[in-house]
Amino acid sequence: TLIKKAGKATTNIHKRAVQLIQKNGMKAKVYIITGLPGETDKSIEATKQFVLDLKPDKWICLLFTPYPGTPIFRNPDAYGVKILHKRFREYVQSYPSKSHVNLYEKETGKLLARNKDLEARFEDLYHWLNKLNPESMEYSSFNG
């Protein structure tokens, strides 16, 4: 998966970190990223279950964006990503939007971004999270 290729931590590590933070009287904020290559309705449901198990105090829901200067931006083919914009000024760091990336599945070449399935999965997760606990939302890249 993209997360493994990018060298990101596993869900078990994230869960343990949130538990330790909360156990020590601090608030845990999690970043939930959707729109990764290979994402499916099933993986969104798994993300929802993970959030239920995690019980974060705050959450931020973002659409995957390979920012200029990152390893994914510099080598998109290795991660199954196609870059839509090449200049950093075309990205809004704090609030990435659905128009910033053009993702495709490497194996099939199927376009994902600006695809109704991708947007529907993102909006489904965003609205589910907001319904779960609206006070927990700090901000999101959802703009519709």
Segment roles from a protein language model:
Residues T1-N143:
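A structural motif corresponding to the C-terminal lobe/cap of the Radical SAM core domain
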